[in-house]
Amino acid sequence: MKSTLRISLKSGERIFVNGAVLRVDRKVAIEFLNDVTFLLENHVLQPEDATTPLRQLYFIAQMILINPEGADQSTAMFRKSIVMLLNCFKHDEVLAELKRIDGLVTQGRAFEALKAIRGLYPIEDQILNAQELTPATVEQIRKEIAPWR
């Protein structure tokens, strides 16, 4: 990390830091002085909210950060999912971004990958609303990359 990173948390808010879950009892500011892997509570996607292909991919990528002990398994599932999504989506911007996201995860930059996946949600919503991905395809993806259900 080239510089320190300072974040503010509200009372009762949780943060996931290097696999540990921390909850603060009052408003605080935390300054990270070195490299750290963290995820703010408001960016954590719950399993029941992983209802679309990209949200499922996000859930898998966040598990790489939240559960370091299972990172190898989550990364393998991420790779399988990326391949499937690259074969299903036809939208050029989505395909290019999925390739970039795959590279970010390969480089150990899962936090940045999560931000990039969130950025694709509006396009995915348009694709799903226009049924550019058929409901059957979406259901097949859901079955293949959602073993936590």
From Swiss-Prot:
Q: Which GO terms describe its biological process?
A: bacterial-type flagellum organization; mRNA catabolic process; negative regulation of bacterial-type flagellum assembly
Q: Does the keyword Repressor apply?
A: yes
The protein's matches in InterPro entries, at most eight in alphabetical order, are given as:
Flagellum_FlbT (IPR009967)
Tell whether Oxidoreductase is among the UniProt keywords. no
Q: Which Pfam families match?
A: FlbT (PF07378)
* Record keywords: Bacterial flagellum biogenesis, Repressor, RNA-binding
Gene Ontology terms, MF aspect: mRNA 5'-UTR binding
- UniProt-listed HAMAP family: FlbT (MF_00783)
| Family indicated by similarity | Belongs to the FlbT family.
Q: What does this protein do?
A: Has a post-transcriptional repressor function in flagellum biogenesis. Associates with the 5'-UTR of fljK mRNA and promotes its degradation.
Tell me the protein's name: Probable flagellum biosynthesis repressor protein FlbT
- Which gene is the coding source of this polypeptide chain? flbT
